[in-house]
Structure formats: structure tokens, C-alpha cells
Amino acid sequence: MRLTEFWQRMAVAFGPHSESLAEYHVFSQLGGRTIRQALADGEQPKGIWRGVCEALEVPAHQR
């Protein structure tokens, strides 16, 4: 998954809250990091997206 696709999926799933979610929400599925921290640490967007979907119970049709 490309980074642009990741951000598109975030926007569809979380709308205007996607940016603050990425900046401030700490996910146990991402090793106790935020989305931005995980990306900065070199994690792949696809793995991050899977963690976000699991944590926030994103509906299957949006995954």
C-alpha cells in the first residue's frame, strides 16, 4: 500500500478526524505509538492500516 492510499483510506474512514487521530491517538497495535510515530519509524502503511482497523473496528467494506 502506498502512503497516499493509506491517507485516502484514513480520510474515508475517519473524515476530518483522521489528522488528529494520526497525531495524538496511541495504538497498542502499533507498539504504543501514534500513526505518525509508526510511519516515522519506517513501518509500512499496510501494517499500520491493519492495526488501525483492528483497534477501531473499521467495517470490513472500508478495509
Stretches found by the model and what they are:
Residues 1-63:
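C-terminal alpha-helical interaction appendages
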